Amino acid sequence: MNEEQQKAVLSLNDTLLIAGAGSGKTHTIINKINYLIDTNIYKEKEILVISFTNESVNDIKRKCDREIDITTFHKLAINIIKDENYHLAGNTLDYIINEYFESYAKTNKKTNQIIKRICIETTISNLKTYIKTFINLYKANYSSIDTLWNLYNKSHFINKDYLKIILDIFLIYQRELESSGTHDFNDLIINAEKLISNNIKKVPYKFIIIDEFQDTSYTRLNLVLAIKKINNAKIFFVGDDYQSIYRFSGLDLNIFLNIKEYIPEITILKLVINYRNNQETINLANKFIMQNKKQIEKTVICQKNLNKPIKIVYFSNKQTIINKIIPDLFGTTLIMGRNNKDKYDYNIKETENLKFLTIHKSKGLEFDN
């Protein structure tokens, strides 16, 4: 381990480790777990590791041979409330959105006109996705229906049209959840936090490691802060503001950037050595990312150099790309696509060393190519 990684492993305070892609983040997490257990600072049952996706959780499990809890936020919340007669809503929101457009919107003249105005700029399919995204964002950050009404009343023109439809669907959705006695994933985490805060449920965790912390929401943060308060636990946040991609599901990068507002005495460390790329590629990527002035400026160092590292190659069709490039690669290879449809468009046949994942599902994983 390099000096920065050693500092991170040895830190016993609340810590934010800013770890860029290729900096040995997972290696550092595994070594920290081993250090905490081997030195008898914490017992295995007292350590909790949280990551964002099932894929990243499974990746850590494969690399960690300790009997500790490694889970997602949602599975943690389910474990906390499992005896509370709690029922998940499933695809209720998708169903309500589709029903709204297929029945009510077609028969209600005013709503139909609103949709036609909006769809000058987008499609019905995209509009449905925007609405689902908005509601998830809204609920994940504790916003109330009154706030949404105020936003609607202050809006003008096309924004007001959007909000009218969102308000309709949001109200129907909340009523359906209440009448059926079900809850969505946002409610799941909120209620788990309440059970911990009110001392109704207890968990054994005294050291919490949160991977991909840049991808968090206020509801998730409050859940771990509740555990921290009740158990006097320490938290080891690991993340990189350059890699935040889950805004669509209610996540807020400001939590990462302003972590001292929530834990004033937190120690902030950085992993600045990149083992994956060359310096030229890193410099180009950083120049692009820093166009957003809200990002944390950091110097990333690499021992590799490569003249003109980026090449643009044009192919006549998608299948040619796979046939031309894949045979020349060694080790494990990941092909990333925008959605699952790309896997079939490219006719990708997965093997032990060749995997296809969407960009979102690949978050936090490591491959040779």
Role assignments for model-derived ranges:
Residues 1-88:
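P-loop NTPase Walker
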Residues 49, 70, 209, 237, ...:
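Conserved SAM-binding loop
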Residues 85-168:
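ATP-hydrolysis module of ASCE/P-loop NTPase motor domains
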Residues 218-311:
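Conserved RecA-like helicase ATPase core segment
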